[in-house]
UniProtKB/Swiss-Prot annotation:
One Pfam entry name: 7tm_3
Subcellular location: Membrane
Phylogenetic placement of the source organism: Eukaryota, Metazoa, Ecdysozoa, Nematoda, Chromadorea
Compositional bias segments (type: Low complexity): 114-140
Keywords annotated in UniProt: Glycoprotein, Membrane, Signal, Transmembrane, Transmembrane helix
UniProt protein name: Uncharacterized protein C30A5.10
Molecular function via GO: group II metabotropic glutamate receptor activity
UniProt organism field: Caenorhabditis elegans
Amino acid sequence: MIRLVFLFLLVVLSVELLDFRSNNYRQIINNALPTIDPQMISQAQAAINPYTDIFVNPPNSFVDFPMANIASSGAFWQQPQSTVSQVAWNPPVSTNPSSSPAASTISFQSYQNPSTFPSTTTASTTTSTTTMPPTYQTTTKSVKKNTETLWTTSKSPMKLSKNPKPSKLNQKSSKSSATSFDSAQLSVLSHRLLNDVLIIPSSRRLYILAIIPIHQSSGQQNFECGEIDVNAIVRMAAFLEAQKTINESNLLKEIGVDIGAIIVDSCSTDLRSVADLYELLSGTNIQKSDLIAIIRDDSTFMPNTEQIIRQLNLPVVNTFFTTRSAVQTSGTLPSMFLPIQSIISALRHYQSTCVNIIFDEKYSESVSEFQQVALTEGICVEVAIHVKNASSTVSEMVVRRLLLSEARIVVALLSEDTWIQMTKALRSEMVIAGRFVFISMQDQRWTTSRKFIESWPTFEQHLISITPKTPINHEEEIKKLTENIPKLSLPNLWLKQFWSSAFKCHVDNEDMGGSNSFSRECATTQSLNISQVAPDVDVASISLATHAIGIAFRSFVDRVCPGALVISLSDCVNDPFVGFHQSILDSDFVHHLSDIPVSFNYSTGFRDISLRINRVQFVEDRLQFSELGIVDPIQFTYQDSSDTATPSARGSYLLMSSTCPKSTCAKELAKSTIKQQLPSIVKALTDLEIMIFTIFSVLSALTCLMCMYLKVISVSEYRNLTAVTFLGLAFLSISAPAFIIPPNSISCSLRKLLFPIAISITIAPVFVKTVLIWKSIGSSSSSVLIAFCIVLIQTVISTEWLLLASDSATEFVSTLHGTMWRCSPGDSSEEMILLSCSLIALLSLLSFIFALATLKHSQSLQHLMISILAILFETALYVSLPLIPYKTRDTVMATTILIFAFVALLLSHTGKSSAKKESECGGTLQKTNENWLQHVVQSPQDQMTLVKNYHTASTHAQSTMQFEKRSEDTLRRNTSLYGTEGYELPTP
């Protein structure tokens, strides 16, 4: 027992000695000072923040432009120190430039030690003062090479290796300060990285990598940067403001963390972005584990950059309409599927059925989605042109191809450079003003970029743009950013270029990416108004992306490692990024820059927001956007908010209507439209023409039945077969509407089964009668049985053809004769029905032969004519129907059946039938030959005796025998005298 207790105590002691804390946290605790005094506490706090010693030794071009404190006597580029008003950039005069003035001033912090950012600012209703950061001395003397240095922040060395060797500088700093993390002073061979990267420090290794196009592309080598983008500066300010707000909120303060940022200037160029990311992750000690997410604010097509982002496997939040799907990618704006649906909804609203599409590599996947949606919605894409490069030659060829098409509306899914070349090509090809209506995604640079501003005066076509709906509080956010932009710690070069581009002036003679091309020199006093500098800027998407990452981070920490001291995102989970991306998708919050609660569509990963469709007009040297309609993202419905037939600036009218009936696409669209509309029996019941035709068919069937009754009571010979023939004509009349009803399972079955049976009921008795007459056989019950057997054989044949045919009753056919749904097997459906009646055709031919052989018989003439009619009927349909269009073919077939029934009904009353030779009194005496009447003249007494004998014959057999004998003697005598029967007594 004592051994067990001792063993239990050892187990408990070993568990207590286990340390589950992270390596960083254990290092912090192990390096704690033994004595507690204020100085040691400050050193310990510095040890917890591994990014305190971030410092950049700027290149020589930055040294000439210190922005630590803007001078109060003149423009900031002319004085070493200066101050600027909060809203109006009009610095007051001060006698002491080194101290902050008493008035409302804002200090512009230069590209300095970011450990002091953001600066402590005390704001009141009228004034605000900013404490100036201290000056840090660089230690460039310890570096042998004369290169630019970057004080980096991570414990890891420069190269991305798991077990790197510590540098000498790291060993030296660890000896000097045992309470801080190792800091590495790494050599940066490229000045470009210093110009392209801005780091906002964090007390932890938690950074958001923001890819923002601070500069535009040069458009030449696709590597160098062009002019600065004032929209990007404003959006970067919104990003920094959102980051500051989320760090100062209780959301992150409660867990003791704050999130930093690494802003990379992509210059809207793929190669430069790749170089910056590569040097950032391999040329500095910034590691992948320091990054928690990526905010991509550059919508430029950058396949190589996207490949690097996929290799990083970080959650990506896009702030634009995403054109390509990727893993762990979401967005605060919808994907391109929603703008495509918006365009289609607007086109359908204005009854446009035909469009053209021009696109480049960026929208290659979106075009396939557009074509699929357009096909389902009944809109034809006449021409889809892939613009492979942004050259003038290619653009001119595209314009020539558009001029050859019928469509007036052109959906232009183009990048910036391609769109510029397209506007030039429209001018060089001298396209008539208002010839096309272009629909494109609205770009913020349309109102700020010099390339666009110079192209709008010569653009004479109509332009429709798609853009997110502006939130209600957007203007208030712009005013707030107007006050905060001068407070940002921006690189001096960025600030000079922003000033120059915003006020269309040049600061000095330095090369600043084309900004010195402005001839006017910048004034010493300027008022900043973002609504005029960047009138179309949208800051909501990037602000919401930052807040979504912050809220998702808190949710992820609470779910995975609650209560832990989080230094990096991988402290609790080995692979945290999949779960963190899921936390971003699950985030749901309310923000003042969104009219509805912010949430992500779980199936797509993007937000569903309302889109605004604008009409763009260049009026008085400015672009004006007038709203045409709003698209609901839930129901994909378009709500028109203005008239689309309003006059433009040049007197033409915008007509959102485009058709191309002669194009191949329209024909294919018609096929798809007809194919989608499956015929049904319900539609046939409501069609007026079909109902009228059916009424005539029923009347024809009733007429045949009435004639059958009259014929049966008036004919003594073969009356049963005659009744069956008339019954077949009635069934034939009823089968006629099946050919005019739209093809469906019921009508097709009636066509294949009822028509052959009806025609067999009509022809089989005629065939049996002709054979019996030819054989001189009288009518009997067996003759009806023979006709019934023939009908049964035809029924079996038709049923087998119906069951052994294709599985579907209908088939969609598109040939020269038309495009429509038809009974299977499609084009040859009527031909197959007539082939199934081959037995009836053979019987009709035999009936014709036998009737011709017994033409002397009284009923042979009508049998002959009915046989000829049946042969002509079947032959004419079999030969002519394949040559008739589909819509006319069914009508011809149904009408011919009714005509055949009516003509056969008339032919059945022709010929020398015995019924026509009988008298109305039952067949006593007919006036056939006057010579016969002269030799047989009876007195009235003899006539009365004859009548009495007739009545007596019905009751007395002996009298009947005498009467028959007398009649036979009279007939024999008349035959010998005149060669014909003089009269005929009725058969008892």
